[in-house]
Amino acid sequence: MSRVYNFSAGPAVLPESVLQEAAAEMLDYRGTGMSVMEMSHRSKTYQAIIDQAEADLRTLMGIPDNYKVLFMQGGASQQFAMVPMNLMKTKVADYIITGQWAKKAWQEAKMYGTANAVSSSADKTFSYIPDCSDLPIDENADYVYICENNTIYGTKFWQLPNTKGKPLVSDVSSCFLSEPVDVTKYGMLYGGVQKNIGPAGVVIAVIREDLITEDVLPGTPTMLRYKTHADNGSMYNTPPAYGIYICGKVFQWLLSMGGLEAIRERNVAKAKVLYDFLDASQLFHGTVVKKDRSLMNVPFVTGDAELDAKFVKAAEAAGFVSLKGHRTVGGMRASIYNAMPVEGVQKLVDFMKQFETEN
């Protein structure tokens, strides 16, 4: 069977060349006579893999020396607890609620102190990003938290909030490495890799060193302390070794594509193909305020639930899979991450045009 066009929100499409490289090395990684899956994480060979992955990520993002790169487990959901456990030293933090994942992070943080919801777009079903230029930031807040790209609702912070000097913590799971980023604008950014970088099971955090301290909330487990992972080079315990190996290959693929500036141009072009069609269509329409549209996740509807279901079924039969919208929203959603080729989006639009003509 030929490969389908996979529009899943995560786990998601990976570069085909990366999959081919991994397949070629599955039984024998560079003359070791074993797979990376079987390799001791304490071996020199694996140490070289994780060191190269970190070096390539630093090159891609321009990460300054005073930021640590941590490869961890637990996904973004575990970070909902780790962030307040490690950073909420005064037991106060401010959260901007622009979707399901920011809301979950905020609810988790309330278990550890005062988590203020300083702004929200819940009033319009998270279809826009609120003005964050002059927020009522708590003077005692240890950080301001956002989910930068909202996978479910298809919105994106195109301008970071004015945190009034407080460290910005950002969940970038679904826009990680989709465009250049000024790391110095963040105290911390993190993301589960299963959307835009690699297989599920790895979360990457980039944290300013002054935020990594022993001064954590009482009772914080050893494994949930950033300092534990920073002091041990992400090797305190057995890391998600194979997942990190795949991430490293994706970093090298991105470098070969020209880096994040080049991948942004490609992503802008892809998104334009789909958004231009949605804006002109008489049947399909987008659900997000135009200025806040994501380049990665594009939700759309017909306005008729039965017709939506018919479209999803027909699309799957035609080789366009995982287009069903999130269970909390309905409709459709096309996740067009870095590895989705432009031709995949164009062919989807061609299919949508045909479906519109026939319905």
Regions of interest found by a model, annotated:
Residues 284-315:
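Conserved PLP-binding catalytic core of the aspartate aminotransferase-like
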Residues 169, 183-194, 203:
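Conserved active-site segment immediately N-terminal to the catalytic lysine
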Residues 77-144:
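PLP-dependent aminotransferase-like
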